[in-house]
Amino acid sequence: MSDDNSHSSDTVNSKKGFFSLLLSQLFHGEPKNRDELLALIRDSGQNELIDEDTRDMLEGVMDIADQRVRDIMIPRSQMITLKRNQTLDECLDVIIESAHSRFPVISEDKDHIEGILMAKDLLPFMRSDAEAFSMDKVLRTAVVVPESKRVDRMLKEFRSQRYHMAIVIDEFGGVSGLVTIEDILELIVGEIEDEYDEEDDIDFRQLSRHTWTIRALASIEDFNDAFGTHFSDEEVDTIGGLVMQAFGHLPARGETIDIDGYQFKVAMADSRRIIQVHVRIPDDSPQPKLDE
């Protein structure tokens, strides 16, 4: 407990020093609490003292201090894994299909994580006899972290210990998901896409236990069916329209609004429309029912 408290104090002090320096250059006086600080950052964006991307990143940096790994992890059901007894060709099939670079390796089931496989470690075997491949030759130690770990501490650990994936466990020692450094960076800079990412035509995609990415063009009817909600589609047909209607204007990326207990955050937008939103469902809500 003392370690967490001392770290929290150091984190708060370092943040206060950074933001005090920044805000002293932009404003007269210092904010007295978090809400005032957020308001000043947003005002600075609206007044064009800082650009939109900088504003979003500053908000993201503040957000990660309030979140736990459980809030951002890839849930167990969404984990793509390899089995310890799989052949080289079987591993390559999974790697090519998923386009991921790191995989938990399991034995019996997802509660039995044997280690982590990095796709690049298979390259030497592709130039020689595939029969020489053995998972034991490429298996790396899996880092295990609790669900309750603070996200800012997780990021610091990723950077200092130079690894990119950790297995998340619950209080009983069962595997509840995994977290990557990319998951944390996306909280700060927005969704990161690479040359392997295809344009997403999936309406609903789970990011963590309570957070989903929603295409703005997804229909309100489909959203209601999946999430058990009762949003009206009398005036607007899509989730993007619902969110814009609630704001009363075209919101910028990073703006957040609460609609009947569901928190909608604009993840992508341009000068004409909302493209994608993140929605956080209430903690006591059942998991959405999606068609396979």
UniProtKB/Swiss-Prot annotation:
Molecular function, one GO term: flavin adenine dinucleotide binding
Alphabetical list of InterPro entries matching this protein: CBS_dom, CBS_dom_sf, CorC_N, FAD-bd_PCMH-like_sf, FAD-bd_PCMH_sub2, Ion_transp-like_CBS, Transptr-assoc_dom
Keywords: CBS domain, Cobalt, Magnesium, Repeat, Transport
Annotated CBS domain residues: 73-133, 135-195
Gene Ontology cellular-component terms listed: plasma membrane
Pfam families: CBS, CorC_HlyC, NMB0537_N
Its biological purpose: Plays a role in the transport of magnesium and cobalt ions.
Family: Belongs to the UPF0053 family.
Descriptive protein name: Magnesium and cobalt efflux protein CorC
Annotated organism of origin: Salmonella typhimurium (strain LT2 / SGSC1412 / ATCC 700720)
Gene name for this UniProt entry: corC
